[in-house]
Amino acid sequence: NVADTDRIKSYMTDHDVKRAVIVGGGFIGLEMAENLMHAGAQVAVVEMANQVMAPIDYSMASLVHEHLQQQGVQLYLEQAVDAFSCHDGSLTVHFKSGVSLQADMVLLSIGVRAETRLAQAAGIRLGEMRGIWVDDYLQTSAPDVYAVGDAIEFPHPLTGKPWLNFLAGPANRQARIVADNMVMGNKVKYEGSIGTSIAKVFDLTVASTGLPAKRLKMMDIPYLSATIHSGAHAGYYPGSLQMDIKITFSPTDGKLYGAQIVGYDGVDKRIDQYALAIKQGATVADLTRLEHAYAPPFSSAKDPVAITGYVAGNILSGKMSPLYWRELRDADLTGVTLVDVRTPDEYALGTIDGAVNIPLDDLRERMDEIPTGRPVWLFCGIGLRGYLASNILKDNGYAEVRNLIGGLKTYRAATARIAPPVGFAAAGDSASPTEAASAEKAVVRIDACGIQCPGPI
């Protein structure tokens, strides 16, 4: 809140904060990381899970990890804070792993819990999640008492199971519903929230709605997913930056379960379209029928939302057999032919171990190099050329052909090793941040996501 912001700003000024540790890699933690970096502090983010931004899947969070590191944020993932100590005015953060960090300031952004003590004291019923139980009209077990906001639990529209939703948008909508029901009697029902959220993380925008794959898996709900990397607007119009979108859907009828987007421009309007579609019970086929406003500065003739619908439709219909990054990472490739269908120049810049290079344009002439009696796994930069190659092979009698969903971009991001933090002196470490950084080999990384595939290699 604003009062906390003023206190943090004053503390930084009064105490000349140079190193800040943020415990918790959620929305608030990452927004604070950005602002503290802009204020001139070195920032470390400590997260107990293996990723930041819990509402999104790991493959999408990995894109955020990469961006945070490019901005100079030190990431400590799968690290739990055990204790804090203060000696001679210096604060030390101790991890359960034995690692410790020195800091001038520590911020805790470790989540919230429903405050229900007043309701309990009044004898009002609590639900399974220990939030305040309400009915469809947001009325509690006490007939004259209604409840809204973070403290209530309500069935999720997609699962029917109660959950706590800590978002301002639904809370404001609930307040309007309760006002109507208190004045006019219980006439307006609350339909529930699917958790549509968005955050600014330095230059990136990260958004999600509905159910991610990890939550569907945890709840034993069968699902499929599709991932694309598409320009926010027409590629020939200047300034088109890539956005990465992942959707989850039912493997039987294509019902849309969730969507996640990581990008720079146009993320907000796309996530709102997905949210509306999900709440209306739409299928992936419905995504291809959405009518988008199109002009080159704003979108493409085939909007990224529609493209996710087409890709998901190809998977559902059997036109494309999906290969997901975890399957490829964990696979024994002994009995598989792994083919990189990118150009030789792209292949020379790096590929997946065990892959042979047969460019898409040469595939028909070099098909005899691919054995017919074993599975063929294809990949390209983002998935499109792999899909085209899979159609060519299937048309020529290859039975077991799969295409890597999201292409090499998704695979590389999801399997990338988090760079060891550099520049934060651990307790007892005599090396200065500058010395520690200079000891590392100088590597300049350029984010060229605005360059058209494959780019001017």
Report each predicted region and the residues it spans.
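Mid-to-C-terminal Rossmann-like scaffold of FAD/NAD(P)H-dependent oxidoreductases
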Residues: A151-D265, P296, S300, P304-D330, ...
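Glycine-rich dinucleotide-binding loop and its adjacent helix/turn
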Residues: N1-A39, Q74, E128, V134-D136, ...
